[in-house]
Amino acid sequence: MKKLTQYIEEHYVTGTDKESVSKLVDKYGDDMFAIIEYGYRDIGGCSGIEKKEDIVNKADFAKLYRNEGKIVAVALYADKRHPNAGSDVYLNDRTKNRGRKIVAIAASEGNSEYLKKILIEDFKRMERNVWGEFSSKAATFALRCGALPIPIEAAEAIMDPKKFYDKKEDGYFYTRDIKGHKHTKIMMGNHLFYNHNVDEKLTEEDIQKFKNLAIKYATEDEKLNHI
């Protein structure tokens, strides 16, 4: 049986700062970009990543999953933490200590199970303070990886000064203007600021409720934006 460290070294490839992310792009950039293009093909691509070189500009941290020697899943993050995030001054300040934001998640065709491995670990590890904005199918995928919905008031503080429009009555979904189009999103993650119990998990009924809302709002967005 393989040791855990051996398994991790064989399957996980990480970049923990701009310099190491840049090295990952030098080595795996074509695969990373192809996977991101595939993952975001239904929504016109990933915002801000139009070529592989853009990955370095968007990501402060990257995690790749390698299966049988090939990169099959990509997760990119922006570091939104304050340099002194652990101090009492900033620990509970959502406007300064904003955790680690997911900026892109994708898997190559038929390999979503490996992206799920990355996200399940991230949403389980509370100290990572991982969160992201999701809509439509991506919202359901994140929920099934253990992400917890974040109330609008907390999401708005974290996203400040970006403006929220049409805050939905459910208390979680909101609409933002992105490149001239209205997009309804839900923020989800595991951040302690969100006042979730560490052991809290959504029921299947909860997941289905949020899934139905995500699909409903995505359909409304398509009509509104004439897609």
Outline where the language-model segments fall.
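Terminal substrate-recognition subdomain of acyl/acetyltransferases
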Residues: 4-18, 78, 82, 129-227
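Helix-loop element at the rim of GNAT/NAT acetyltransferase active sites that forms part
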Residues: 31-50, 217
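A conserved beta-strand-loop-helix scaffold within acyl/acetyltransferase catalytic domains
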Residues: 43-67, 71-100
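Conserved acetyl-CoA-binding loop-helix of GNAT-fold acetyltransferases
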Residues: 107-124
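Short, high-confidence coil segments that cap the C-terminus of an alpha-helix
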Residues: 59-60, 125-128
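Short amphipathic alpha-helical segments and helix-helix/interface helices
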Residues: 52-53, 116, 120, 139
